[in-house]
């Protein structure tokens, strides 16, 4: 049997996102988290405050270098879930309320702006990466959060389960 270990390592090194790219995503994620925390603390101090959990390819250690487009750039992203954990569903706001507040918190974060999509708010960056910010509500003690999706309100969605499964936890 052929030993292709060296070829696999070389291929993996080519496709996986560089440390500098991962560091940029992490720095931008932390900056956005701080902005959202401050926004809720200053504007909605009596409401449930956001908590965060990264998800998607970054959390599964499968973030790849993007395929370049005609401008020589390639889009890549990070997904960062925003969780609102309350003692009952009576504390839950509307799907649109969560989208509006998150959008207001981040809309001027970059010169590229932000967009409110059905499943999340997206913040765009000049180097063609973006950060998706889906919102979730969960009653404390419940097993699964519900996603604030505008087309399918309060759908069951737990990306943490997928990440844990993928990472063998």
State each model region's role:
Residues 79:
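Glycine- and aspartate-rich repeat motifs characteristic of hemolysin/RTX-like Ca2+-binding segments
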Residues 1-76, 84-97, 123:
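N-terminal regions immediately upstream of nucleotidyltransferase
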Residues 36-39, 43, 96-155:
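Conserved catalytic core of two-metal-ion nucleotidyltransferases
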Residues 161-169:
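Long, charge-rich alpha-helical interaction segments
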Residues 5-8, 12, 136, 144, ...:
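Intrinsically disordered, low-complexity regions
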Residues 82-88, 102, 106:
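Generic hydrophobic/packing signal
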